[in-house]
Amino acid sequence: MATPNLYWPVYKNLEKEFLKLADYIHISDDQTSIYSMHIADLIVRCSVEIEALSKELYSSLGGNMTPTDTNGDVRDLYFDTDCLDLLEQKWHISKKEITVSAINLYLTEEKHRLLLPRHKANKRGTSGSKWKQAYQAVKHDRRNSLKKATIENLLHAMGALYILNLYYKDERTDIGRVYLSDHNFDNRAGSEIFSAHCCHATCIAMAYHMDDSCISPPLGDELERSIYIIKYDDKSFREMHKNFCLDFQITEQRFNNSPEIAKFLSEHPEYKDKSINEICLAAGGDSLLMRIVCMQHSMGERSTRMEALLNKHSGIYPELLPPTTQGS
């Protein structure tokens, strides 16, 4: 029996309370420094959830639940320098980006709309993130630290909790068939305030040997910023590879048996190291290319599906080898 998710309902209730603020405050770029006791309370509640959830995720990653100090004595487990630091090592979580997308939040400046709420969250004191400094301040001295209980700090704390919840849920979402599909992934992922940054790994250079290096162009910084990866599901990826291999075998047979190609290469030996496509185009243009290159298996596929995968930096696609070496 699946373990019930106790964290998401709490997060959704915090979202509701935040959005109630927007009924009374016009939350725009020049209003983010507004502070109040109620906002302070929301920051504390939100941060308590962050502490609990970070420890859950730390445990799921095999973190040491009984750390020791320099003397070898068991010490408390710290949610930031222990738990969030491990999440940073595994998932690069400080670089994960979200967008404020609620229709009743009127934030137009990029610094208020595009958030990196986990940035420096694994640090302590003045080196840590501003929302975490605000949490510690209002928790221990609310009267003198109330000005730190701002909408901006609350929004960042909410964003940090949102990201942790997505990683805790660890959902793989079926987007549906590529062929004749009008479905898209809803990157709000259940939130009424935020949208998670996504990257697309669906532009692939087909080859006999397939893995993540076939994603073109390389995802680079987009992968670092992304919480979800839009990709072909593994079954479809394997089917695409199989169809490519079948088509390429036929293409090679046609190429090797073509009198036009043989004649051209005998007259132009400098082309022998070129690709099949380049040789065909030089020897006979588009018409020869269309007669040589086979696409019947690849073009006939109609069941290819896409999915949204949580980005854990653990690889996107399986490694696939040429048919002659599969399983050898």
Language-model segment annotations:
Residues 50-61, 162-172:
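A generic secondary-structure signal for well-formed alpha-helical elements
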Residues 151-199:
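Amphipathic, Lys/Arg-enriched alpha-helical patches that create a basic surface
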Residues 5, 9, 152, 256, ...:
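Alpha-helix boundary/N-cap detector
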Residues 1-46, 52, 56:
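Charged alpha-helical initiation segments
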Residues 216, 220-328:
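Preference for solvent-exposed, low-hydrophobicity sequence contexts
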Residues 179-225, 232-233, 238-241:
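Short helix/strand-capping turn motifs
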